[in-house]
Amino acid sequence: MAGSVLFDAPGPRARIRNWVISAVTAVVTLLVLWVVYSRLDAKGQLTAAKWEPFLTANLWKTYIWPGIEGTLTAAAVSIVLALALGTALGVGRLSHIAPVRWVCSVIVEFFRALPVLIMMIFAYFLYAQQDVFPSKHLALAGVITGLTLYNGAVIAEIVRAGVNALPRGQSEAASALGLTWGQTMRAILLPQAITSMLPVLISQLVVVLKDSSIGFVITFVEVVRQGTQVGAAYGNYVPALIVIAILMISVNFALSHLATWLEGRMRRSRRGPAPMHADEPVTQGAFGAGAGGTI
């Protein structure tokens, strides 16, 4: 029915009860915030002296900017590698060749089950023992390896689910046109699957950015680690963490906004140009009028 709803509209008593619950929740929230503010103010964490260091260029140059640079570098490289690895593994799991499908399935399930931190630590010590990278890049390589392997496995499942969600008629039509499985996957299925699953991919890319902070365990210079060092150096842990939180929220919001814009652009490009409007049909009377009104 056009006017149906999923639940009954609340009556007068239900509206009053909902209003009371909302008011009590708001009051309790304000009280909790006031208690937190009072405790921080009593400890002197909200004084102007605690925030003044963030107005100096030396603090940003020494602590914050190197952390931002490390976080963005690790996230950018990991995102590119994870997308490539995830797409390859996702397509492999859909392969008609059984050994390829089994190997890709084992790889995906294995790296999905491992914690990111364990993979970072393992890669860090492996690279250190084998002298794979210079010592100054060991932590970065370990972070990128852990983020790439874990998120690549997750993205593989996203790609596989996106392809499986498409109508079977897509593949059948491609087969009728004589396209091979690889051509069908590359030209028809993957573009549609990635576009339809783009919101989920965006969420996973934000996870990549946030998980880069785990790298502080292997001495990776990232923004959260640098924030704690600011707190230790200036004795302003709370202001430092607040600033770092604002920076991370801003970067994540920018990434989400960019991905949303890209999604809209991709959807608009798939629609193609607007259809041309047909001219008004010429009637027999029009010909007659043009020839003096008679035929």
Predicted regions, residues:
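Transmembrane alpha-helices and adjacent helix-loop boundaries
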Residues: 1-295
